[in-house]
Regions:
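TOPRIM metal-binding catalytic domain and adjacent DNA-binding surface shared by DnaG-type primases
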Residues: 1-50, 54-57, 92-93, 128-131, ...
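Phosphate-handling DNA/RNA-contact segment within nucleic-acid enzymes
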Residues: 41-137
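Short, surface-exposed amphipathic charged segments that create phosphate/polyanion-binding patches used
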Residues: 48-49, 131-135, 175-188
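Acidic beta-strand-to-loop metal/phosphate-binding motif
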Residues: 100, 136-149
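Phosphate- and divalent-cation-binding pockets in alpha/beta enzyme and binding domains
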Residues: 109-110, 125, 149-152, 174
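Short, acidic/turn-prone active-site loops that include or flank metal/cofactor-
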Residues: 118-124, 142-145, 169-171
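Short, aromatic/basic amphipathic alpha-helical patches
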Residues: 149-161
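A generic structural motif
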Residues: 163-173
Length: 204
């Protein structure tokens, strides 16, 4: 009920703070409109940026609430909704290669056919959807501090017969890299083999 859309100008003092925070994360007006980004100034989600996720039918299936101030003790506040879902499913074309990232800010930076895991491993619903839709190619782009998780995820996907590409994020998250540098890395990435995964486990 406290949600206010950020693509509409507001006299609320937090409006400017929210826009400033998003600009700092390279999120502009087009992204705000595309992802229906808003903010809250009251209730349990006060001072937070709200980024909703919608399923294939356009129904809300999750939302992320991120504090817009740097001194916050709790950066994220999870909603009373299950994470067993497919983030940003409304934007996904299952016939095309899919990119898997950790968070919504990573997904917004990547833009094209990308699913935020809302963690480091896919939900049961997402796994089911990948199998159902017979997804052929997946790019794994987890944050730099999750190398072992990325290796484990790549092995998991390969076991399902999915062509998997494990991206070397070069010490940055997708949201830190930005759109063009991320896609440059993606296009340079070669398909992962089982032997590569084993070596990765030994050296990661």
């Amino acid at each position: 009920q406290c949600y206010k859309p950020l693509w509409k100008k507001s006299d609320d003092p937090l409006y400017k703070n929210a826009i400033h925070y998003l600009r700092h994360r390279n999120i502009g007006p087009i992204d705000i409109l595309r992802y229906s980004i808003g903010f809250c100034s009251s209730n349990g989600y006060a001072n937070r940026i709200i980024i909703p996720s919608y399923d294939a039918d356009g129904k809300l299936n999750y939302f992320m609430a991120r504090d817009m101030f740097p001194n916050s003790k709790f950066k994220y506040k999870n909603p009373p909704m299950s994470k067993d879902t497919v983030g940003f499913e409304m934007f996904i074309n299952w016939k095309e290669p899919i990119v898997l990232v950790e968070g919504v800010f990573d997904a917004i930076a990547v833009r094209n056919n990308v699913i935020p895991l809302l963690g480091k491993f896919p939900s049961k619903t997402l796994v089911m959807r990948l199998v159902e839709k017979q997804v052929k190619t997946i790019y794994v782009a987890l944050d730099e501090d999750a190398k072992q998780d990325a290796i484990k995820l790549s092995k998991f996907l390969m076991d399902y017969g999915i062509s998997t590409y494990l991206l070397n994020m070069r010490d940055k998250d997708p949201s830190e890299l930005g759109f063009k540098p991320f896609w440059k890395i993606l296009k340079e990435t070669k398909q992962s083999k089982f032997s590569d995964i084993i070596k990765g486990r030994l050296h990661a």
